[in-house]
Regions:
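Catalytic loop of short-chain dehydrogenase/reductase
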Residues: 127-152, 157-158, 162-165
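Active-site loop of short-chain dehydrogenase/reductase
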Residues: 74-76, 89, 120-133, 166-169
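The beta1-alpha1 cofactor-binding region of Rossmann-like NAD(H)/NADP(H)-dependent oxidoreductases
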Residues: 53-64, 95
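A short, exposed helix-loop element centered on a Lys and neighboring polar residues
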Residues: 113-114, 158
């Protein structure tokens, strides 16, 4: 049976690596982002689909899943990778920018999870994955908006895992504790004479972890996995 996957908040890093690894195994993959022009090369590479969606809009998220239904049916796995980022001194933050960041990270995660859960409950199971960050468990100075959103997303995953796990829907949260070596990042410019594996997470390695959790037997499901470079302090 062909695996069907929907990756929301798709880009060039860990989400692209997950799309590639799934496609290599014969999966059908749909990619969702606000700007799908940036996904053209990846879509063609994996033979997948690209759907435009603003995850903060109820109607757009509902339409995303309707389009996915029409293209390939109910996804077996949904990865929520979208995230908002705003930082700065608390006295200087733009409230509207903070609101948008929270909507994208937390509320968008809820909307996508709700649509995924409706379908997976009807089909008898599935997996809903979420990409977190160091800020999911630790609030740093001047990073209040990012931590607020990621804390909310983590709380969502814990609640969903307890509600949906007994109904055969695997909910997992991945804490990416460090910087990702996404294409286009120049490590030599940032940290000269540094081995990238010492300071950044490789997107392909993150994707391998997603796949490993996806393939877990339900007698031994992970709810949360944290990933970091081997020399990262924590």
């Amino acid at each position: 049976m062909t695996l069907k996957a929907l990756i929301v908040g798709a880009g060039s890093g860990n989400s692209a690596s997950f799309a590639r690894i799934l496609a290599r195994q014969g999966a059908q993959v749909a990619l969702a982002a606000r700007n799908i022009e940036k996904l053209a090369d990846l879509k063609n590479e994996i033979g997948g689909y690209a759907i435009s969606c603003d995850v903060t809009e109820v109607d757009q998220v509902a339409n995303l899943f309707l389009q996915t239904d029409a293209i390939m049916g109910t996804p077996d796995v949904v990865l929520y990778n979208a995230s908002g980022f705003t930082s700065g001194p608390i006295a200087e933050l733009d409230p509207l920018a903070v609101q948008q960041s929270l909507m994208l990270t937390g509320y968008g995660g809820f909307l996508v999870a709700q649509q995924a859960a409706k379908r997976m409950l009807a089909s008898g199971g599935g997996a809903i994955f979420f990409t977190g960050a160091t800020a999911s468990i630790k609030g740093f100075p001047q990073f209040a908006p990012f931590a607020m959103g990621k804390f909310a997303l983590r709380g969502l995953t814990q609640s969903l895992a307890r509600e949906l796990g007994p109904l055969n829907i695997h909910v997992a949260h991945f804490i990416i504790d460090g910087s990702i070596a996404s294409p286009g990042r120049d490590l030599n410019a940032e940290k000269p004479s540094t081995n990238i594996d010492d300071v950044m997470l490789e997107p392909d390695a993150i994707a391998e972890t997603y796949l490993s959790v996806l393939n877990q037997h339900r007698s031994a499901w992970s709810q949360e996995v944290d990933l970091r470079p081997w020399k990262e302090s924590f």
